[in-house]
């Protein structure tokens, strides 16, 4: 792909502010760490990864090569980056407010939605930047302890990236998957996956 992944990961640069490069770098570092652990005799019985990390989980479980994982997530990053113009999307972590209350505040706001239910007391919202900022003010008024903007380059985990998801599905048709050596847990259903044929749809 012409990407100098070593320079990207180990040299100071501004490219990591763009999800096209961030995703490739994160998967590279994750899989390098996984290789070191295996060399030291630590091998997983099952893998899992959140969002982008699911690609690492699949690669670690034997479902795709590290090279394919890096190439695929770079394409994923490009599609996500192109879906929403730079600076127009945003994400924020809402701390200390019940999920039901957050859902209530966002119910009549079409440009912002919940991205992740991370854990009780920490929920991430995503959407158009202006809508996320307005929702942040409303959530603080509703009792949120804090609403922290996330340092991301787009409105990830939102319906604004629906077209990118469709295009990624086409890209995944070209990826060589292998039979899983161990199960992994998918983000979509939180269930074990043992059949690689289900992976393309779940991603």
How would you label these PLM feature ranges?
Residues 3, 12-13, 61-203:
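Alpha/beta catalytic cores of group-transfer enzymes, especially the acyltransferase/condensing modules
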Residues 28-35, 54, 67, 71-74:
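A broad detector of short, well-ordered amphipathic alpha-helices
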């Amino acid at each position: 792909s012409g990407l100098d992944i070593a320079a990207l990961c180990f040299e100071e640069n501004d490219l990591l502010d763009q999800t096209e490069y961030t995703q490739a770098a994160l998967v590279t570092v994750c899989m390098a760490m996984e290789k070191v652990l295996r060399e030291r005799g630590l091998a997983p019985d099952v893998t899992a990864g959140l969002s982008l990390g699911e690609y690492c989980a699949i690669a670690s479980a034997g479902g795709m090569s590290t090279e394919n994982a890096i190439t695929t997530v770079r394409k994923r990053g490009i599609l996500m980056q192109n879906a929403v113009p730079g600076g127009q999307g945003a994400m924020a972590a809402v701390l200390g407010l019940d999920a039901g209350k957050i859902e209530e505040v966002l119910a009549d706001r079409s440009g912002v939605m919940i991205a992740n239910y991370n854990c009780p007391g920490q929920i991430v919202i995503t959407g158009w930047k202006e809508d996320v900022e307005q929702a942040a003010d409303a959530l603080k008024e509703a009792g949120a302890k804090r609403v922290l903007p996330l340092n991301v380059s787009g409105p990830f985990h939102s319906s604004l990236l629906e077209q990118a998801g469709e295009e990624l599905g086409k890209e995944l048709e070209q990826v060589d998957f292998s039979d899983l050596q161990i199960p992994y847990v998918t983000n979509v259903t939180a269930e074990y996956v043992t059949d690689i044929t289900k992976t393309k749809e779940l991603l």
